[in-house]
Design a protein with these regions (language model features):
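Long, C-terminal-biased catalytic regions of enzyme "large/alpha" subunits
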Residues: 1-127
Length: 127
């Protein structure tokens, strides 16, 4: 067990913190530490496997466009851009620079629902 893990383990054990709460605290700490490390250097995505990459809104655009095609509910460029802008607004409201992929996916789902793209939303959730 490394030093940091031991410190955290002892703290959680000594304070009788529920394992589910531990998982949430560790996930939040990971995001907050990375956010501090990157500071104001743009926006970053924390991938599922732990890597960090520069945020690219074009990836969201292409994901939504491909999903709409797969759903048989083709969205035009303007429609997709509206969803992307909704996602960016949600990200900016958080006031940090590192976003886990699952959080960005949730924002896309919320934007699709809010804008009335139910069929695209269902397909997006299943991808």
């Amino acid at each position: 067990m490394n030093d940091l893990t031991k410190i955290l383990f002892d703290y959680f054990k000594d304070n009788d913190i529920d394992p589910n709460k531990v998982a949430t605290l560790i996930e939040d700490a990971k995001i907050n530490v990375l956010d501090e490390m990157f500071g104001e250097e743009g926006e970053w995505v924390l991938k599922k496997l732990g890597s960090v990459e520069s945020f690219d809104k074009e990836k969201i655009f292409h994901s939504i466009a491909q999903t709409s095609d797969s759903a048989g509910a083709k969205m035009n460029t303007s429609d997709v851009n509206i969803i992307v802008e909704d996602v960016l607004k949600k990200m900016k409201s958080i006031k940090r620079n590192v976003y886990p992929t699952k959080e960005i996916r949730r924002y896309v789902e919320e934007a699709l629902e809010e804008e009335g793209y139910k069929k695209v939303l269902e397909t997006y959730k299943n991808n």
